[in-house]
Amino acid sequence: MDDSVNTRYPILLVHGLFGFDRIGSHHYFHGIKQALNECGASVFVPIISAANDNEARGDQLLKQIHNLRRQVGAQRVNLIGHSQGALTARYVAAIAPELIASVTSVSGPNHGSELADRLRLAFVPGRLGETVAAALTTSFSAFLSALSGHPRLPQNALNALNALTTDGVAAFNRQYPQGLPDRWGGMGPAQVNAVHYYSWSGIIKGSRLAESLNLLDPLHNALRVFDSFFTRETRENDGMVGRFSSHLGQVIRSDYPLDHLDTINHMARGSRRRINPVELYIEHAKRLKEAGL
């Protein structure tokens, strides 16, 4: 078997908002775990809430890390978090750095999401609209977790939204600043408390006319619409997270021609991308291995 990405420590893929490990044959990290396994990596997908705040999800993740260490005898783990999964991973690394070898943020809103800001403004706190929307999205999150075989996971969509706004993440960053850049658009420290920090992300590039077959992807089209909600990082975002907002630790690249869902390999059949998202994970696993992680 190919052992080119047989990292020293296991890799945990941490999903984001409305995420899951798998529903039937459909994986959140589509084709990524399988590809890493085939290249010799030991990969796990933890079971955490589809919608909740960063700390609640992080506490769930930490418990599973302890269980995994007992099961496989690993001293530490490598965390790769997509979207809110990056904040979940950062929280665990901040409170238990001795258990974490590395944190990698993939399209993570490490300085908040302007889309979350707009959604937050659309609902007046305590009013009926907010209550109804929160109830519906929480129920949807519970439905997703039930479909994935985990119906008892706690869900709170309003807490999740508040945790992803610019203000919410700013408060989070004051408590857990590890790996953050000291200037907007810069890189953060590559290592803090013996934890290595990395990030990569993409942006939606070009006009609709230039995208040809990508216009067949309805999710990509929706993310293109969401781009109009951004003011600080207009045309420098992936539809959900701004380019510079994603920066953490060693920034591998933050302008891949990929939208927010492309980075977990969710593309409509027939659409085309110049970058293979799965290869980014394989390359990164090689990077972790070369770093002794």
From Swiss-Prot:
Pfam families for the chain: Abhydrolase_1
Cofactor names: Ca(2+)
Ligand binding (substrate): 17, 84
Biological process, per Gene Ontology: lipid catabolic process
Active site: 83, 238, 260
Catalytic activity, reaction form: a triacylglycerol + H2O = a diacylglycerol + a fatty acid + H(+)
Protein name: Triacylglycerol lipase
